[in-house]
């Protein structure tokens, strides 16, 4: 079993299910997970993707499969997807987990992270790229832009999730206690095109409109999905 995306919801659900005595083979229902099965008898209304044998030899089929997957990254509208692997059965990807609420986002970033690299990297001289982001603040997740060059949708989704200002200030205050802190924060933001709020009034209950890339956002700023 694989937990994909950001993982907070699915990891907890997996742990609770295993703690209750369920075998891992029974955990076929958890959003934000991928699992292997022999047949599709326990998978409700799956989208059948091109087989592994097809996508590995045909670029057009590979692109077609990717397009189908891209259209099924919204937890409110996505369906399970099945890809066959010859005689070995199927790999099933369940729909993504629901996005975190602001309270859940705040809880995640309130945890006592060390902000240090794993000791295994010390003998290699650390991770140079960490120096640029160590004193940065993640304010949000997800992006509804839908830019053609970006695959962020596949692990953070298009539904914007934000932290409260209080949470950001608390983390910034903790940074000042780090002996390596030089007095300035490198960046406050996330993987979006400076989006901070949901793309429309229905995003958090109905999902994000399909086929509405970032170029649509400048048309009429206060429209809802229903208007479009």
Give the positions of each predicted feature:
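N-terminal pre-triad scaffold of radical SAM enzymes
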Residues: 124-151, 184
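Short secondary-structure boundary/capping segments
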Residues: 17-20, 154, 164, 199-215
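N-terminal [4Fe-4S]-dependent radical SAM core
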Residues: 61-136
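Conserved alpha-helical substructure of the radical SAM core
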Residues: 154-184
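Flexible loop/turn segments at secondary-structure boundaries
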Residues: 9-12, 101, 144-148, 156-159, ...
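Terminal amphipathic helices with adjacent charged low-complexity linkers/tails
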Residues: 176, 183-207
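Single conserved hydrophobic/aromatic residue that forms the stacking wall/gate
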Residues: 218-221, 225-227
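Glycine-rich beta-alpha loop elements in corrinoid/cobalamin-binding modules
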Residues: 1-86
């Amino acid at each position: 079993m694989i937990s994909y995306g950001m993982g907070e919801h699915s990891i907890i659900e997996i742990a609770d299910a295993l703690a209750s005595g369920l075998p891992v083979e029974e955990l076929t229902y958890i959003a934000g997970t991928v699992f292997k099965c022999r047949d599709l008898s326990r998978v409700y209304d799956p989208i059948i993707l091109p087989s592994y044998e097809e996508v590995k030899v045909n670029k057009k089929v590979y692109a077609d499969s990717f397009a189908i997957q891209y259209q099924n990254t919204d937890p409110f509208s996505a369906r399970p997807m099945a890809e066959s692997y010859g005689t070995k059965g199927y790999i099933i990807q369940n729909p993504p987990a629901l996005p975190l609420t602001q309270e859940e986002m705040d809880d995640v970033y309130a945890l006592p992270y060390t902000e240090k690299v794993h000791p295994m990297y010390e003998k290699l001289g650390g991770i140079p790229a960490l120096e640029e982001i160590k004193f940065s603040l993640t304010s949000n997740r997800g992006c509804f832009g839908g830019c053609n060059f970006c695959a962020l949708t596949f692990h953070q989704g298009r539904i914007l999730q934000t932290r409260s200002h209080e949470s950001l200030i608390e983390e910034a205050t903790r940074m000042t206690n780090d002996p390596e802190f030089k007095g300035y924060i490198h960046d406050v933001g996330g993987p979006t095109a400076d989006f901070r709020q949901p793309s429309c009034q229905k995003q958090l209950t109905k999902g994000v409109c399909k086929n509405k890339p970032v170029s649509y956002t400048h048309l009429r700023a206060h429209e809802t999905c229903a208007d479009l």
